[in-house]
Amino acid sequence: MDTKLIVSASPHVRSEETTQSLMANVIVALCPCVVASAIIFGMRARLVTAVSVVACVAFEGLYCKLLKKTNPISDLSAVVTGIILAMNVPVGMPIGQLIIGDLVAIVIVKQLFGGIGMNFANPALVGRIVLFISFAGSMNKWVFPDAAVDQLSKATPLAVADPSKLSLLDLFMGIHGGVLGETCALAIVLGLIYLVATKTISIAIPASYVGSMFVFYLIATHSVHEALVAVLSGGLLFGAVFMATDYVTSPFTLKGKLVYGVALGIVTFAIRYWGSYTEGVSFALLFMNLWVPYINDMTRQTPYGYVKPAKKEAAGK
């Protein structure tokens, strides 16, 4: 029996869940963020989201048609990628640039590596990083959700010199600048509750990631307020709930998930606290995506009754 594709010890639990049903649950969980972005940033947020989804589905369909492969549109994974990438860009992101990110996510990161389940990193994550590196000006042009300063560039909470002056309520409700999906913590929490309630994801990764970040900032700043600001600011919550929990690029054991989450917290904290870049979530996720195979190997469950083979004696003895 070929065991190359067996990544966990038996017994293997089977269920009636399909890729389509899991992706559908993720889409439902993303709806609060999509609705919140439309309320906070207006009609263009809907346009950005719609274009991103259509582009991802179209690129996947075109790629499969050209290579005469079965179009996997029914699994809804391209829709999820399109929504997540849209939630990772500012409302003013030029449509042409956004479509480039969709192309990278679907064709290069997902399909060229063999399709769903074969990608080395989260497609939407890599698409966001490519957009950030290639179009830094567009990705760093924040719009503050206030009619009086509509379409004006505004600093995000992470760039504020004195975090103690920031309102936790404003951060929780999304009354601050940022990308579409990260601003409203309430919407993200609602999505998390749905995903956990439907057993689509485990709470282990979001809890260990966000919890470790809170502890690290509490130790570093000696301030509960500043630690909460760090948790509610930037892409931490959105990344922890919708990107770090990606099935393909996250560990499969509970121990592995906890190790992964804490490691994400360490890397993100290091980038934010000591680095020159105020965010850090995207690069932390990409870095840790590469370590997932090793985490899986180190935390692999030992089969019941397994006996480690004795080392062979040296020849001649």
List PLM regions with ranges.
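Cytosolic-side transmembrane-helix boundaries in multi-pass membrane proteins
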Residues: 1-22, 271-317
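C-terminal ends of transmembrane helices
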Residues: 58-70, 106-118, 188-198, 241-250
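N-terminal signal-anchor module of multipass membrane proteins
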Residues: 1-57, 315-317
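Structural signature of hydrophobic alpha-helical transmembrane segments
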Residues: 42-55, 92-101, 171, 175-185, ...
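Loop-to-transmembrane alpha-helix initiation sites
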Residues: 120, 124, 206, 228-236, ...
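Long hydrophobic alpha-helical segments that form multi-pass transmembrane helix bundles
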Residues: 117-189
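Hydrophobic alpha-helical segments embedded in the membrane of multi-pass proteins
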Residues: 28-31, 54, 76-84, 99, ...
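Membrane-interface helix-loop-helix junctions at boundaries between adjacent transmembrane segments
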Residues: 77-78, 83-149
